[in-house]
Each structure stands twice: as structure tokens, then as C-alpha cells.
Amino acid sequence: TTITRLVNGLIPQFYQGDIHGRVLVDGQEISNIPMYQIAAKVGSVFQNPRTQFFNVDTDSEIAFGIENEARPPKKLAERVEQTTEDLHIQKLRNRNIFELSGGEKQKIAFASVYAMNPQIYLLDEPSSNLDMTSIQELRDHLRLIKKQGKTVLIAEHRLYYLTELADRIVYLEKGEIKGIYTSEEFRQLSEHEREHMGLR
């Protein structure tokens, strides 16, 4: 979570702390990039999607980020339509967000980021409130953005659904890198080793 907050600029903009080292996005020091520019490049899906909602209805929420880019209404409508088609969530259109299940809320949070077409996606514990079907759908969405050449950074304890998608798995313990694995190397770890690391 801390790393995702560093990459999206929430640290040090909104969360204080001592930072040692540098965080670079596209070769630029993150602390030198205005938040509006970071938001155009980096999309974040938080562990609890309710904390990132600004609207009551799903279509307005999906359009919120691109609306702030001052796109014409026709372009907004087209992008919302394209987003819901790409992510197969047409059935969630024009719904009250607060009547959705946890998994459906997560899909809307992801869709609102996807609509902005960022180069970098940050997801914080995205599977934590999802059932098996929703986790499979999340994996499909991640596969889609990976095919589009996007960079995806995920903070997660459940890794089983990511092992075929991940290029690299970085294991952190108390803020220190304890291991870097390819997907294949991670699959070779025993169940005992993964449990000892607190991973599933």
C-alpha cells in the first residue's frame, strides 16, 4: 500500500512521512510532478472502492475522471459506452452505486480508472472483498490492460490468480524487499514457503 501511495503521489501530498530515496514515474521525480499530471498517467483502484467514489450513479462515476479533462459530452458518452463494453459491465450502467455488491463496486472503481486510459494502473488489495467469480473477472480485466501494454502494480496477499499474469513478484516485509521472483520462480515456491511469507 505504501508503494502504491508513493507512485500515485498521495505520499507526500496527503500522507506525511520521511521519504528516503526517489520515486520516478516516466523518468521524472514524482514529487516534482503536479497532482493533475500524475492523475493523467497513474490510475488507482483502492482496497475499499467506496473511498474513491464521487457520485451516486455508476455512469457518472465512470465518467468522473474524463469529465474533469473537459471532454465534450458526446465524447464522454462514447468513452463510457466503450469502457462498459470492453469490461463487459453493461448491466451495471445507470445503477445506484450504493445498491451494488462489493464486487460490483470494485468493477465500477476499475472502470472509472480504465475510462481515463492511464499508462500505469495501481491496485491495492483488489481481490480482498471479491468472491471467486469476481476474482476471475478481475483477472480478465488485468489481462486486457496488460495486452494494451499498460504497466500494472498490485499490492496483494492473494497471488494465486496473478501468477500467470505477473512478470515480476516483489516480496516486501516491513518495508524491505526480501525477494524478487519471476512468475515461474514464484510458482516453484513450496506452499509452506508461501504461507511463511503470508501469501496465498
Predicted segments with their positions:
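Conserved ABC transporter NBD signature motif
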Residues: 16-28
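Conserved ABC ATPase "signature" region
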Residues: 74-92
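Conserved ABC ATPase signature
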Residues: 96-100, 104
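Hydrophobic anchor residue at the start of the ABC signature
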Residues: 110
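Catalytic Walker B motif of ABC-type/P-loop ATPase nucleotide-binding domains
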Residues: 121-124
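H-loop/switch region of ABC-family ATPase nucleotide-binding domains
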Residues: 156-157
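Conserved beta-strand-loop-alpha-helix hinge in the C-terminal portion
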Residues: 176-199
